[in-house]
């Protein structure tokens, strides 16, 4: 029997979930507080669909590195300690997860979900509903300038799907990296990884959904509170009235924690600030990458999205209330110029920041809450676009009372 499902949050996670539910014959009401969809973390993210490279941020050595990077504008990670009890709790859980064993366990959970997501994205594209969203099977090249990090990456690489490259092989594959060849010690190449424009994907999802009579979009409406009866949610209250439904899914990213507090549901999600630059893709060949590149040491990703080059970087913890930090953008541009000195218009690139809704251990939170018709699809961090289709499929299967396509071990609070 078809259900009416309310989804809270219209970023790539909420829209993907709406699409999967509509395809499964359900009725969907999508609630979004902004004037349009995809306006937060989904708007100008890195654009990489890195299905084979999903290692959590929490890893051995990261806390010590973070302390060494304090106050350095060009460092991959900036940390500002605040009086927030939530931040302290999140950092404590993050620190406990910063060891090789836990990193590998959570990395395996993420890989399980990302491979499901890859399969679902391929199926969605084959349906022909989603138009052009700058999708390319461009491959991903993870370059290393440090021998220790490269040896670790080589140990954990899946040699069936990933290749180890020497500096000479790196330049042969991606000649635009010629200016830093002397700094490179090696790379991991994943030829099957993809890239796409997340915001364009969101807009195309919405365009399709709005052709479906079972879909309703409520923009500029914030959920003020849940209406509950025993262990069920019967509705949500917005300033425009009460919306009732059979099931409710929270896909509200960074807003999820405050929203769920009224139900005494605590979720360990913290907004980790990241930055991106968008610059016109140059016509001159071998000026910038044709394939996805991740500069591992600097934590910078490069992706070609139609006629744009998207460059995304950095993690700032404790800066969730501030706007664009110009000193970080300036430092990012300086690194880009050293890596790709022939790239024009870096100084005039369009700057953006977003807050990645992140769990301490890395995997998102998926599944049912103590309220048996309230579901969570939150905490995807920097992998929201990569994991969106798989997460949507899981929630759709669960809500339609079917078995999850993968084990949900590791995806709970």
Segment roles from a protein language model:
Residues 3-30:
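N-terminal Rossmann-like FAD-binding beta1-loop-alpha1 element of flavoenzymes
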Residues 23-43:
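Glycine-rich FAD pyrophosphate-binding loop
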Residues 45-48, 53, 57-96, 223-228, ...:
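Active-site substrate-recognition segment that forms the wall
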Residues 89-207:
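Rossmann-like flavin
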Residues 183-239, 243:
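Helical element adjacent to the flavin cofactor pocket in flavoenzyme catalytic cores
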Residues 296, 340-413:
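C-terminal catalytic lobe of FAD-dependent flavoproteins
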